């Protein structure tokens, strides 16, 4: 179910403050955050945000195509190692 338009996009307050400060100072240093649930706004374009994936912070460079998506979509939490090899194929 999509979020109501009248509510607007959700962004954690502490992340919004960090983004405003980075834009004002033109700081290129990655912004570290644990807020995977925050929506990417047009203000974030060009910034690098380090999103926590449960183990480490994954740097995500925000582009125009990402606006409207959540930060967590770009920091994968699971590592796929591949399916088990077929035993018949080894013979």
From Swiss-Prot:
Q: Which UniProt keywords apply?
A: Ribonucleoprotein, Ribosomal protein, RNA-binding, rRNA-binding
Domain of life per record: Bacteria
Gene Ontology CC annotation, any one: small ribosomal subunit
Give start-end ranges for the coiled-coil region(s).
Answer: none
Q: Which Gene3D superfamilies match?
A: 30s Ribosomal Protein S19, Chain A
InterPro entries in the record: Ribosomal_uS19, Ribosomal_uS19_bac-type, Ribosomal_uS19_CS, Ribosomal_uS19_SF
Gene Ontology MF: a single term? rRNA binding
A GO biological process of this protein is:
ribosomal small subunit assembly
Purpose of the protein: Protein S19 forms a complex with S13 that binds strongly to the 16S ribosomal RNA.
Q: What NCBIfam families has UniProt attached to this entry?
A: rpsS_bact (TIGR01050)
As for family, the record states: Belongs to the universal ribosomal protein uS19 family.
Q: Which PANTHER family match?
A: RIBOSOMAL PROTEIN S19P FAMILY MEMBER (PTHR11880), SMALL RIBOSOMAL SUBUNIT PROTEIN US19M (PTHR11880:SF8)
User: What is the protein named?
Assistant: Small ribosomal subunit protein uS19
* Organism of this sequence: Methylobacillus flagellatus (strain ATCC 51484 / DSM 6875 / VKM B-1610 / KT)
Gene this chain is encoded by = rpsS
